[in-house]
Every structure is written in structure tokens, then in C-alpha cells.
Curated annotation (Swiss-Prot):
Signal peptide: none annotated. Modulates RecA activity. This is Regulatory protein RecX. Disulfide bonds: none annotated. It is found in: Cytoplasm. The keyword Nucleotide-binding does not apply. Belongs to the RecX family. NCBIfam families: PRK14135.1. One of its GO terms (biological process) is regulation of DNA repair. Its main location: cytoplasm.
Length: 269
């Protein structure tokens, strides 16, 4: 089989169409064209063509991978998953990853270090959340343990406290005890240890005093009473007390407030 003509593709000047015996047969990247010294008049066997096609697949995949990496640093697993989605053959994926490693495009340790530092500085994620994300990105336990040393306990507490302050602002209608529990629960879900979560909850609510809690209770009592006005007095009282207890106020505190403020649930005559 002989190459009878070679033409540059219209939409991609770095790719060439190869015609064998006057018929289009395959296309190749410019680098593959030069490597295999493809030119008009050259004779190729079926094995030659198959080898060239495989080399071109690797070249195309390499170009795609480099473009994929141009947006941000990636882990080896992220690149492997990307290439598989591009329907690259397994042999091509392995060869592309080897070439990228040789070109210093892949380094999981450097990736993990950069990713961890970025997450610590730009987000308020807890260490366990970052660890889970690194696992999902294919990092080994050894690498994860190494890079997580960057997340020192004092920085964890600082970030957890900032997160706690945000949680507190969204839940400013609850008693201090309930608010602290809400903060602890949310922080644990965000990847912080229970110990750090407790310290952050205490720190975030440290400025809440008795007067603040009394003010919150007053507003909640007024709101809950209005909501339960349609019920009979005994039911309205029970629903009000239950609702307030669910917000973290103790039964004794509620009863004392109702008594001291002479709040009655009896129907007015």
C-alpha cells in the first residue's frame, strides 16, 4: 500500500489526511507525520498503519490532557478519568500518563500539597472533608497524611470558629445551649473533629450573655403565642412550651418567664 497524497485539514492545520491508493485512509498529528516520515510515495503495511494510528491516538490524547491541565493542576486519577471519558484505549491512557509524568505534568505529592493549602486558605472546610476529597482524587493515604500536617490545630480552630460565627448568624433564634449544639453538629458534618467543634462553639457564643438569651426568649414567646392563638388555651400553652423547649430553652426557664411577665393563655372576656 502506497501513500498517494497528503493534505492539511481545513479546520486544524496541525493535522494531515493520508490517502493510500488514491483513497482517504487515516489522519495524523503533525508530530506523528514527522516521526514516521510519512510522505507521498512511501509504502506502508497493515501493521505500519495500525502502529501509526495508535501513535496518533496517544498524541491526540496527550494534547487533550495538556489542555485539560492548563486550567488547573490535576491528580493522576483526575487525568486518567478524563482520558477514559475521551474514549481513549487503555494502552493509550497508560502511555499518555507516563509521558506526562516524564514532562513533570503529573506529581501527586505536589498536587496534594497545593490542593490542601488552597482549601485551608480559601475555604472553611474541616480536615476530614479535605481528606475525603483527596481520597476521591486518588491520593494515597501516605500522601494525605503527609500533606494534612499543613492543617495545624490552631488553624483548624480559627477556621472552625469563623464557620461557627456564620452558623450562629443563621440560627440566632435559639437558646445558647441549643445554638452550641447546632454549631457542633454542623461543624462535625463539615469535617471538624468533635473536640475542635466544641471549642469553636464555645468561642463563637462566648459573647452571648443572659440578657441576650432573655431577649431571644421574649421574641420567641411572642411569636409562638401569636402562632398558637387559634388553639384552646390549654393546648396553646402546651404547644408554646413545647416549641420553646425545641429551641433549647429549659422548661423551668420558660415557666419562670411566663410567670414573671404574667402571660396567661386564658381567653379574654
Amino acid at each position: 500500500m502506497k501513500i498517494t497524497s497528503i493534505s492539511v485539514q481545513q479546520k486544524n492545520k496541525e493535522r494531515y489526511n493520508i490517502f493510500i491508493d488514491e483513497k482517504y485512509n487515516f489522519s495524523v498529528d503533525e508530530e506523528v507525520l514527522a516521526r514516521y516520515q510519512l510522505m507521498k510515495g512511501k509504502t506502508l503495511t497493515e501493521a505500519d498503519i495500525e502502529e501509526i494510528k495508535q501513535a496518533d491516538m496517544v498524541r491526540k490524547g496527550l494534547n487533550k490532557a495538556i489542555n485539560f491541565l492548563s486550567h488547573r493542576v490535576r491528580s493522576e486519577k483526575e487525568i486518567r478519568d478524563y482520558l477514559r471519558k475521551q474514549e481513549m484505549e487503555p494502552f493509550a491512557v497508560d502511555e499518555i500518563l507516563k509521558k506526562l509524568a516524564d514532562m513533570d505534568y503529573i506529581n501527586d505529592v505536589e498536587f496534594a500539597e497545593l490542593y490542601t493549602k488552597t482549601q485551608i486558605k480559601t475555604t472553611l472546610k474541616g480536615p476530614r472533608t479535605i481528606e475525603r476529597e483527596l481520597v476521591e482524587k486518588g491520593l494515597t493515604r501516605e500522601i494525605i497524611s503527609q500533606v494534612m500536617e499543613e492543617y495545624a490545630s490552631d488553624i483548624q480552630l480559627e477556621n472552625a470558629t469563623k464557620q461557627a460565627m456564620k452558623i450562629m448568624k443563621r440560627n440566632n433564634k435559639s437558646a445558647k445551649k441549643m445554638l452550641q449544639q447546632k454549631i457542633i453538629t454542623d461543624l462535625i458534618q463539615k469535617g471538624y473533629s468533635s473536640e475542635v467543634a466544641k471549642m469553636a462553639a464555645i468561642e463563637a457564643t462566648s459573647e452571648l450573655d443572659v440578657a441576650d438569651e432573655a431577649d431571644i426568649l421574649q421574641k420567641q414567646v411572642e411569636k409562638t403565642i401569636r402562632k398558637n392563638k387559634r388553639y384552646k388555651p390549654s393546648i396553646a400553652k402546651q404547644k408554646t412550651i413545647t416549641s420553646l423547649m425545641q429551641k433549647g430553652f429549659s422548661y423551668d426557664t420558660i415557666q419562670s418567664y411566663l410567670t414573671e411577665n404574667e402571660i396567661s393563655f386564658e381567653e379574654e372576656e
